[in-house]
């Protein structure tokens, strides 16, 4: 007989690979994960056939987020937030390159993998080798960025690991500068917009000041995520709060699957936005190619 959801523990689960580190509680996973997503088909299968334009994904290589109380959250990139948007992009005909800050393997929250979702699982299997052996972002900047680069968009998936390193990386700053200067897309969701903070490093103001974004609500990281044991403590800083302080406009305070386009910046509020953000990115990229 299956266990009643209300009987599941709200205590975070210890991660035995690291001192004082924790996975989300069983109860929180029952609320936040599912075997399938809301994927409802690809709208533009094979629509892009020329083979030039690609997507550069900046993924997380660090698993642990140190919290205010000294505990660590065992995280990574959220598999739905990464793989469902990429499924739409790859099925439309765009190749994907994977980079991390140091070239170390990508870390994923496998506990959030929708194991019965063919779209997500098939994309994971196609990308697994690149996820294990990604490019080093500094090498991409040196060798593959410029006005003639083949990258049409930069994609930064979420998961709490996006708050570690990426938000204060000068390499990420250079990549975002390149995207803005060369009229390329920046696509990100949930905690991924933490990467946008890098644009303001050592500057009086961020080049993204005035842009509107969707982002994971700070209120959940401060409240429900702790109460149900998803997080084992409070984050040292909050994504929407710091984005607002850099002059960006956060348009949501809840988690509904909302997406937003502001110029070439495409954002989503949570894993619930993954499917629609993938569709939005494909539509915008195809339109941009037609108008080039």
Swiss-Prot record:
Active site: 190 (nucleophile)
Comp. bias intervals (Polar residues): 1-12
Biological processes annotated in GO: DNA repair; methylglyoxal catabolic process to D-lactate via S-lactoyl-glutathione; protein repair
Keywords: Cytoplasm, DNA damage, DNA repair, Hydrolase, Stress response
Entry-linked InterPro entries: Class_I_gatase-like, DJ-1/PfpI, HchA, Prot/Nucl_acid_deglycase
Compartment(s) where it occurs, according to its Swiss-Prot or TrEMBL record: Cytoplasm
Function: Protein and nucleotide deglycase that catalyzes the deglycation of the Maillard adducts formed between amino groups of proteins or nucleotides and reactive carbonyl groups of glyoxals. Thus, functions as a protein deglycase that repairs methylglyoxal- and glyoxal-glycated proteins, and releases repaired proteins and lactate or glycolate, respectively. Deglycates cysteine, arginine and lysine residues in proteins, and thus reactivates these proteins by reversing glycation by glyoxals.
Family: Belongs to the peptidase C56 family. HchA subfamily.
Protein name: Protein/nucleic acid deglycase HchA
